[in-house]
Amino acid sequence: MSYWETTGHSDEWYTPTYVFDALGCAFDMDVAAPEDRTHVCTPAKRFITSDSLLQRWSGFIWMNPPFGGRNALAPWLDKFFDHGDGIALTPDRTSAPWFQDAWRRADAVLFTRKIRFIRPDGTPGVSPSNGTALWGSGARANGALQRAAHEGLGVLARPVRLIDWRDFA
């Protein structure tokens, strides 16, 4: 089990500035923001700081949700893809059921190197045990992920929509 699958002292790990610089876009809303945003650099106009899954999301969103325990990301990703306009950040746990479900719904996914997230006190954290996936939903997200790939942030992949294999038999 990875560190992010266990319950720790805090689920607050902030995205470093260079990720947003590579994306080159601004967001209408950060749907998983902390109350104290002193060390948060998300370029967003509005911030949801509590009960986000119960709130109405609008516009082009940024989502770096609490990773929590096993399958804690599933409800966040379900709401993200239902919303259909934004970029989400998660671990790149390709064998996890939530990851495979999200893969089927994504327009694009950017696989990054390990990101040293920012602690609530503003200091960089240690290198995580795995890489990160940035999920794109909608045209603006696709453009931002394409730009980030060109900037060298990661490798861009697009899920293949499965068709009935019997059509080829």
Language-model-derived ranges and their functions:
Residues 1-169:
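Class I S-adenosyl-L-methionine-dependent methyltransferase catalytic core
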